[in-house]
Amino acid sequence: MKNNTGYIIGAYPCAPSFHQKSEDEEKAFWRQLADTPDIRGLEQPCLEHLHPLGDEWLMRHTPADWQIVVTAIMETMRRRGGNGGFGLASSDEEQRKACVAYYRHLYQKINAINAANAGKIVALELHAAPCASNPNVAQATDAFARSLKEVASWDWSCSLVLEHCDAMTGPAPRKGFLPLENVLETLAGYEISVAINWARSAIEGQDTTLPLTHTRQASQAGKLGALMFSGTTLNGEYGEWQDLHAPFSPFCAQSLMTHTHVRELLACAGSDALQFLGFKLLEINPDADVNHRIAILRDGIAALNKAQQ
């Protein structure tokens, strides 16, 4: 019996392992999260594995009925730290191919896990990362189209969802990926939908109304597949317009993301059949105890529940 109610939680930035803490703390964190209602499953990054302690460790310490949405963002950014050309939308052909090879690893990993646990991984979030040193949007779009043609041709056992990140054309890019209009144009011929992340859209224009605009654009194109809520701030520990997954307001006093914003995006999505809905939040204090890490996530669940009342 698969669990299709509740939220997909990007809990990993709150996990003790995100701050290289002990395995005992990590076990306590997942045990408390497992006892939390309204969770459908997890958004989990995949570097070599789905968890720093391995795939099996994650499966063993989380409920069997939780589903997983895999995100490519963490490894994409790690690799771009060493080579800014790495990405599916990169005009650097060698690095574009290196990124496609990483997606081949994801494909093999996901299919192996789903072969052993049918329906465990429901979606992969992919990203249109261009060559960081080349501002040419047309070249990035062309590169993304070539990557997509190859990656989409594989026999995936999960859905593919493009997570929009702040665009390379924005005033102060953090990720600086392909603009949404170019993403939608490239996805037109594919059964690949779009995930809008609240902060990643707000950061793009340094504008808290842009997530709603992006949600509307994706919906009108018939491509809205998921909504994920991460916050951003103007000051304080989470910085100025940073992509650091600030919790909801008022739990995080500086957060720009409110229950009203959630309500707006859900109203805009309306009858669109979302593949998943959830949030990703970061514990900014590396020395925080497990209870505070869990409190951030439980507040996120409460915020989404409240927005739907």
Curated annotation (Swiss-Prot):
Induction context: Up-regulated by L-ascorbate and repressed by glucose.
Tree of life domain: Bacteria
InterPro entries per record: DUF4862, Xyl_isomerase-like_sf
Changes seen on gene knockout: Does not affect aerobic growth on L-ascorbate.
Pfam families for this protein: DUF4862
Family: Belongs to the YiaX1 family.
Function as written in the Swiss-Prot or TrEMBL entry: Member of the yiaKLX1X2PQRS operon; however YiaX1 is not required for L-ascorbate utilization under aerobic conditions.
Name under which the protein is recorded: Uncharacterized protein YiaX1
Organism: Klebsiella pneumoniae
Taxonomic lineage: Bacteria, Pseudomonadati, Pseudomonadota, Gammaproteobacteria, Enterobacterales
Gene expressing this chain: yiaX1
